[in-house]
Amino acid sequence: MSRNSEKQGSMLHRFQQQQANAAGLLDVGRTVRPTYISGVESLPQAEKWRSQVMKEISRKVTKIQDPALSDFQLRDLNDEINKLMSERHRWDLQIRSLGGPNYASFGGKKRGYQYYGRARELPGVSEMLQSQKKDDTKKSGDFYIPPKNLNMVYFGYADDNVTGLMEFEKQRESELQDMLAGKPDEDSGFVVGDITVPEEGDLEARLLEERKRRVQALLD
């Protein structure tokens, strides 16, 4: 009797897994995150993987503030954050190509290797950053901003540090799960099988407006 129950449970698990795969869902906790990002053709999966990357970034950005870390540990951790930021950007592009939100519109314009948290205090790094800021000021003609007034927006990290934006992404993830489960969306009034897709321009306008509001809130 016990063996029959185990067999039935196994069959049910396989059936549920097949349904999840067909719907584009997967258990990210048990699956290795793909390195070939452009090969992920399911929007829900891409959003799930991006969410996992965002959580890793958040944990490491918090950890890099730890005053107990050595210079060696800070450099290693900063390298890891930069790699995750690069991966996050590739997921942004893939999600956009699959018809999802344009997350890249929330990001800063800075590209390349960046320093976070206490890594900015490493020997040689602080001097280099000060020199870069002075060069940028001369090129742009803008006034110099004292270090005490700098924030995460300046360093191109506002999209991952703004609480409101994180809530927006959580809401987006919840909406996707409801759509795949066939749960009606009270705000939009649609269910799976009768989906009204917003115009691309409307979605971009909404995301741009959200970005402006969040950045302005930080600067006020």
Curated annotation (Swiss-Prot):
Q: Per UniProt, what is one Pfam family of this protein? A: Isy1
Extract the InterPro entries matched here. Answer: Helix_hairpin_bin_sf, Isy1, Isy1_sf
Mind listing the UniProt keywords for this protein, alphabetically? Cytoplasm, mRNA processing, mRNA splicing, Nucleus, Spliceosome
Q: What is the lineage of its organism?
A: Eukaryota, Fungi, Dikarya, Ascomycota, Saccharomycotina
| Subunit text | Associated with the spliceosome.
Q: Which domain of life is it from?
A: Eukaryota
> Under what name is this protein listed?
Pre-mRNA-splicing factor ISY1
Entry keyword annotation includes Manganese? no
Classification via SUPFAM superfamilies:
ISY1 domain-like (SSF140102)
Q: What GO molecular-function term can you cite, just one?
A: first spliceosomal transesterification activity
Q: Where is it chiefly localized?
A: cytoplasm
Q: Which GO terms describe its biological process?
A: generation of catalytic spliceosome for second transesterification step; mRNA 3'-splice site recognition; mRNA cis splicing, via spliceosome
Function field = Involved in pre-mRNA splicing.
Q: According to its UniProt record, where is this protein located?
A: Cytoplasm; Nucleus
| A Gene Ontology term for the protein's cellular component | U2-type catalytic step 2 spliceosome
Its family?
Belongs to the ISY1 family.
Establish whether keyword Nucleus is in the entry. Answer: yes
